[in-house]
Amino acid sequence: MEWSVDANYSYLGMNEFLNPVTNAMDPINAPRHKMGMKLQYNSRRYPITGSLNARYVDGFKWSSGIYFGDIRPYTLFDVHLGYKFNDYLKANLSITNLLNHMHTEIVGGPSIGRVMLLRLQTTF
């Protein structure tokens, strides 16, 4: 099969828990809804592969030590390309957050934009 599609969804039924130390409700630091979809191509004829991935992460409350606040929902698109030169050498290019949507995944952490990674892999 040259083309394949994959989809996933997760639902978290709770968004807070009773902290036994403070005896107060704390956020669980995770989104209620997450979903993803992947369209993948694996050529039978040529030594190439590729995929386009989409991810959605729902907004949620965050609390950890001195850091607390809201994580805004975000949608990201990723691209992965691979080329097999021979039985011993492969190259992979991954572009995460293709559209450079600046977003925060944890309160107190940096905003994350596009990340590109080129990997050469050898086997022997």
Where are these regions (language model features)?
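Hydrophobic core residues within well-ordered beta-strands of beta-rich domains
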Residues: 3, 35, 48, 75-77, ...
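Gram-negative outer-membrane beta-barrel transporters
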Residues: 1-61
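C-terminal beta-signal and adjacent terminal beta-strands/loops
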Residues: 55-63, 70-72, 79-124
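Short sequence motifs at beta-strands and strand-loop junctions characteristic
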Residues: 27-34, 71-74, 110-112
